[in-house]
Structure formats: C-alpha cells, structure tokens
Amino acid sequence: MDGEGPVLGFREAGYLILASASGQALLDENLAVQRDEGVDTLRLDQAALSARFPWLNVADLAVGAFGARNEGWIDPYALLQGFRRKAVSLGADYREARVVGLKRAGARIIAVELESGDVLSCDTVVNAAGARAHQIAQMAGTDLPVRPRKRQIVSFECRATIPDCPLVFDPTGLYFRPEGAGFICGMSPKPEDDPDCLDFEMDHDLFERDLWPMLAHRVPAFEAIKAKGGWTGHYAFNVLDQNALLGYHDAYDNLVLANGFSGHGVQQSPAVGRAISELLIYGHYRTLDLARLGYQRVVQHQPLVERNIY
C-alpha cells in the first residue's frame, strides 16, 4: 500500500530436491523444463552435494536440484494480511460469517445465505473456500473433487550447527528447513492413511515413529534432536490430480472456482488472484492463459498430473 509491499520475511535459502538412482531420470526431466523457462537451478551430483552440504548423508543419493536464487520461504500469514489490506483499500467489504446455502435460479446463483439469516444477492460467486470447497459446491447442488486432508508440521531443535541449510525434500517424502533458532519438518501420509479430515488433532507419535529416523538418516547430526511443538492444518486436496481448479463451473453461468491447490496455494496465490480478477472483469484470462486448469478436465476426466510431488 502507498507504494510499499507487505513485509513477508522472505528467507532466500533455496530449495534442495534430492533423488536416489531410481528418481534421477525424473529429476533431470524436471530440471530441463526449469532451465528452458530460465530458472537458475543447479544440478549437483553426489560429490557436489557432499561438498556443498557436508552435513548431508549422500550415500544413497544420486543427484540433487538446488535453486539457490529467488527460492526460499515467506510468512504466509503476512502475505494473507497484505492481500486483505490492499483489497480493503480498494473497496472490498469483508464479512465474518458462515455460508449455509446458495439460492439458485436455473443456471445462476442469485444469493448467498448466511448462518445469521442474512441473504446477500450476488452477480457472481467465487468459491475460494479452501479445504471446505466441497461443502460450498454441495450447496450449489454440484460436486468438486476437492477434499480436506490433514497435514502436520513438527518443530525441533538441534544443538549442532547445520550451516546454510535450505528447504530439503528427501526421496522418502520427508521435508525439513530452518525455522527461527531450530527447524520444522513434515511429510505427506501414504494415500491409504490420508482420509478426509477437518479436525486439528495432533499425532503425537509421528515424530519419533516416522520423522526422526528419516531425519537422522539424512543428517547424522539430527540423531540428537528434540521435538519442541507443532501444529496441524488442512490441504484443499484435489483428488483428481492435485492441481488447482480455476475458472467457471460448467453447471453455472456465474460460479467461479479457485480451489484444490493441494499445498501449492501460497506459491500460486498472486498469479491466481490476478487470473480470477481478469476473468471476472474481462471475461477471459489476459496475463496467463490458465484454461488448462479449468473444470472441463474434471468432466472429461483428463487429469493434469504433476510428476514430482512433495
């Protein structure tokens, strides 16, 4: 606002994606795509990984892709509040209310019903309800392949120094990165252990049972660590292909989707916000053509599958 962006706490420590011999070909394919698009990503073989990150156990690794520039992490809540403040300054009206129904007339949604009893007439409805997107779709008498999936993050401390640690993605699905004076870590569960879920209960055995052994294997200094806390949240998980659903729903003239980001939401939110705004104002995308992410792929069952998911 007033020419100044929000303070996001960007830490440019890089992303390091690791691959064993079985994943080397796929990593190289993805690396080629990134380089074709001008991304400055380094390919590090086993010796280069060991030289650059001497605290890393590379015995079972073949290669790594390291983005040292323009990659890292931010404070997502600061980004959210920055979006909100800017929207309010431009005239947006935020209501803290629970939606309980959508009034329909033919191929249009004509009003939104709130738990308070208020009814808001509307020209267009944008479903951006995150992990509850499916519930909103049901109110419109339709469906979305988006379900709430719980994810857990654990914070831990390590007395040993781990210099220049990036965000590390392990072939096992484990990830970890520095956070404050310590670290945070997590991993996605196996599909059979990943039910639809909206509670915030912690699995207090997750760290010692699953995460700690993998951490200690990849970073020997993590043999001596201590869990400090953690939290849970929910992915808006697109069960079709784990990618966003954007644009108009086929069943309605005025229902727009911005759903199913499956963990990519913070990264993609600036581009998606612009794209949906263009769609509402001009009737089509202008900056980026995101039609391939439309609802038609659900109707036609044509998933757009990401081949390297973390």
Model region roles, listed by residue range:
Residues M1-R52, G173-Y175:
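Dinucleotide-binding Rossmann-like beta1-alpha1 core, especially the glycine-rich loop
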Residues D143, E157-L257:
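Active-site lid/adjacent beta-loop-alpha segment flanking the redox-cofactor pocket in flavoenzymes
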Residues P213-Y310:
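C-terminal catalytic lobe of FAD-dependent flavoproteins
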Residues S116-C165, T287:
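Central helical "cap/lid" subdomain
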Residues F66-T124:
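Helical element adjacent to the flavin cofactor pocket in flavoenzyme catalytic cores
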Residues G67-W73, T172, S262-V266:
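Glycine-rich "substrate-gating" loop/helix at the edge of Rossmann-like oxidoreductase active sites
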Residues F10-E12, Y94-R95, P145-R151, P220-T232, ...:
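A short coil-to-beta-strand element that immediately follows conserved catalytic motifs
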Residues I17-L26, F66-R85, F200-F207:
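Short beta-strand to alpha-helix junction loop
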